[in-house]
């Protein structure tokens, strides 16, 4: 996933796309949530965070990596026209990105990354796959299912169960590659005193 995020940043679109993909991976946000982020939703400071507007008008704030916060600062410096009420990641015309825009830009990023990482060409990388990667990363880092559900904005922790199952399946595949040692079962022979005691009962 990091290879996909590492898009060239020599153009305005490249800088926006890099920030877009970084925030998607950092937060695990839904596409609708990430394209709805406004400048006022970002808090940059000792502890930086972004406020996401999820399903059912529910809001949640998520911490940002220092690198992501730094990238947002640079982006805002390069785009002084962006006001508090402006979308953080606009199109060229200043309007908000659409789901189709995000899918298209992600597809382009994957195509660019495939030149250096051919294995990516075999994968179907989608916005939801980035969200899934965030969930799996949290799980493998030891985060419990309830906290992952809160992070992703799931209505119920039971929705997160599929990520736990996916991680278990991954571990089972790893275990299957390990051949168990060939230990021959030996017959247990109890001590004579134990046999006599059991016979006396």
Regions found by a protein language model. Give the residues of each.
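Conserved catalytic core of the tyrosine transesterase superfamily
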Residues: 1-201
